[in-house]
């Protein structure tokens, strides 16, 4: 059983760098997901439970299941109030999966009370057969705060003494666009490498926090291996840096003006 959470805050507030005041929050929607999976020879069935632990209702809630190129959508829930719960079961074909571990994605699209769209995302693994644990890992996920664009830097390590050809994918909700597709990397024995992705803010609002997921996949002896890592994208306002810069400029000008007045005063005393 796996779960995921995404939070979105809405509100108006005054941001004062010099005084340290933070933005006021008028309401929040926090989507939590729990999944139960069943994999057969032909299909993957996912039972999804969605709850809202925020204090604002989510509207037009639509769950989506994706496995490789397959997609299924659950029935829409018109409104998910605070403390509310919805449950859906979705099925996608899985007869093209060989032995090993494979990533699947569950997304929940919804709107706030102003009909602004958001999406929550969770990624997990399903297992076919009895594969050994994967011999790769994402040891670090480094994400700079997202304004208009940002970088996601992943440390990927080979945990075996053989060269490894792997595919690295970054999964993000629709609010955030990942530039480019999966990165193909070749890892030397026991080596660690950095894989970077650029992300772009499409519809994410300032103050939102979004989980994103990195998947490292490779083939070994006819078995498909996949490992996952998670990071958090924090959406910042580009304007938040302007008051800080202005504060420093104004402060420097004031100090210069005071220093000039002091010099003039000393000069007058010396003349007198």
Please place each PLM-identified region on the residue numbering.
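Short glycine/proline/serine/threonine-rich loop/turn segments at secondary-structure transition edges
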Residues: 96-105, 116, 203-211
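Membrane-proximal extracellular "stem/stalk" segments
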Residues: 124-241
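Solvent-exposed, conformationally flexible loop/turn segments
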Residues: 39-43, 82-86, 100, 146-149, ...
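Acidic, serine/threonine- and proline-rich intrinsically disordered appendage/tail regions
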Residues: 141-148, 230-272
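Short, solvent-exposed loop/turn segments at the edges of extracellular beta-sandwich modules
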Residues: 111-115, 219-222
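Sec/Tat signal peptide C-region and signal peptidase I cleavage site
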Residues: 22-26
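Bacterial N-terminal signal peptides that target proteins for export
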Residues: 1-11
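Intrinsically disordered, low-complexity Pro/Gly/Ser/Thr-rich segments with frequent PxxP/GP/PP motifs
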Residues: 68-96, 176-201
């Amino acid at each position: 059983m796996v779960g995921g959470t995404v939070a979105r805050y809405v509100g108006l507030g005054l941001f004062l760098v010099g005084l340290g005041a933070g933005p006021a929050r008028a309401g929040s929607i926090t989507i939590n997901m729990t999944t139960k999976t069943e994999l057969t020879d032909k299909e993957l069935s996912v039972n999804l439970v969605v709850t809202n632990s925020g204090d604002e209702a989510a509207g037009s809630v639509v769950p989506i299941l994706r496995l490789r190129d397959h997609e299924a959508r659950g029935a829409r829930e018109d409104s998910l109030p605070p403390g509310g719960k919805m449950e859906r079961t979705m099925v996608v074909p899985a007869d093209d999966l060989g032995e090993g571990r494979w990533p699947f994605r569950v997304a929940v699209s919804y709107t706030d009370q102003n009909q602004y769209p958001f999406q929550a995302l969770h990624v997990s693994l399903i297992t076919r057969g009895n594969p050994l644990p994967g011999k790769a890992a994402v040891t670090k996920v480094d994400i700079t705060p997202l304004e208009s664009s940002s970088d996601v830097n992943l440390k990927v390590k080979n945990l075996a003494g053989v060269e490894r050809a792997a595919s690295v994918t970054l999964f993000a909700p629709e609010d955030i666009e990942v530039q480019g597709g999966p990165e193909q990397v070749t890892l030397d024995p026991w080596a660690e490498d950095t894989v970077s992705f650029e992300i772009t803010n499409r519809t994410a609002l300032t103050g939102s926090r979004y989980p994103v997921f990195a998947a490292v996949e490779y083939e070994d002896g006819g078995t498909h291996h996949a490992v996952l890592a998670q990071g958090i994208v924090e959406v910042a306002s580009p304007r938040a840096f302007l008051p800080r810069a202005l504060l420093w400029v104004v402060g420097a000008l004031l100090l210069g003006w005071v220093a000039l007045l002091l010099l003039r005063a000393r000069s007058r005393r010396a003349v007198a």
